[in-house]
Amino acid sequence: MKKVGIIGGSGYTGGELIRLVLQHPALELEFVYSTTRAGKPLTHAHPDLLGSTTRKFTDQVNPEIDVVYLCLGHGNSVAFLQEHSFSDHTLIVDLGNDFRLKEDANFEGRNFVYGLPELQREAIEKANAIANPGCFATALQLAMLPLAKNNNLKSDVHAHATTGSTGAGVGLSSTSHFSWRNNNFSW
């Protein structure tokens, strides 16, 4: 059984990942890191987990963990990894955007592999660091994959995509209020 740690577990991404790990037969949730909620039950941030876990948030990490997921806001994974080191055998999966671009993929001896298992399975299986694609990149790649495999992409692809507000995280900002987001499209 692989032991898993989640960094930034109080947000939407962290909450969904906690739920998936708790239900996975080959994974064991060892810790969920949050400096703002340390000592509080996970269910305070994620009431949908009531009855699934009694675990609490912690401000401690296990550097020998098998897998660590970074569920931090964009731009925060680099800073976290500069302050916290993990064993060479630890698989690091960044769900933010810090390591998605090739020029950012090499970090302190690790080469972050970007991609989806459907497209880069072999490279991901060998990796000790993974940069997970964002929601739009994932949706577009999965939608176009069957066409690309059959050589049916004959011209440029143009996509129009709309996002909700959960991608912005749980923190409030001037752009996360309904009155600002309602019918607010940029062209």
What residues fall within each predicted segment?
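N-terminal Rossmann-like NAD(P) cofactor-binding subdomain of oxidoreductases
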Residues: 1-187
